[in-house]
Amino acid sequence: PAGPDSEMRGLMFAESIRAMEASHWKRLSISHWARATRERNFYNYFAKGRTDCLAFGPGAGGTVSGYGYMVNRNVDEWKASVAAGEKPVAMITAPGRFWNEARALNEQTELNYLDPAALERLYPIAFSELWRPAIENWLEAGLIEPDGSRYQLTVSGQFWQGRLTQALMDLLASASK
């Protein structure tokens, strides 16, 4: 049978958040929760952010100075490469023009918020003006809500977080051409 459509997945996502909160789990990031104070998850935040992240093991991904890389996913091929003294790297991608800005934006949306003014303090780009039409649309659609000088992603916005982030980066890329 076919999987659930986007609307049903959104409803399931919202229900999962309610269930986790009702069970007193603490939200660590867009996709990670903790039950006790000893539980941590820094990987996704740092791997998607501006920090270099060294990846080890089959299927792991990392970044160094903006260059992304993926370790071979096939365990047998990975073992053979390591045994032969070779790096088991499956692919490497060069950083795009706005990789730093993209990573800074990812750091925000990974933690369920958007703060164009904070990005403007880091980079000489008028993010607030550039993204104004999208932000106004998302406010009207209920995907984000004002939170002081920044915007908080609503549950619906959290569901669409990856696409919202990509849309903002697409606007940045198209405006710089």
Give, region by region, the residue ranges found by the protein language model.
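C-terminal scaffold of the Radical SAM
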Residues: 1-125
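Short secondary-structure transition/capping segments
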Residues: 39-43, 141, 159
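Short amphipathic alpha-helical interaction segments
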Residues: 124-140
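A short, conserved structural fragment
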Residues: 139-149
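Minor-groove-contacting beta-hairpin "wing" of winged helix-turn-helix DNA-binding domains
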Residues: 150-154
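Short, amphipathic alpha-helical interaction segments positioned at domain boundaries
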Residues: 156-177
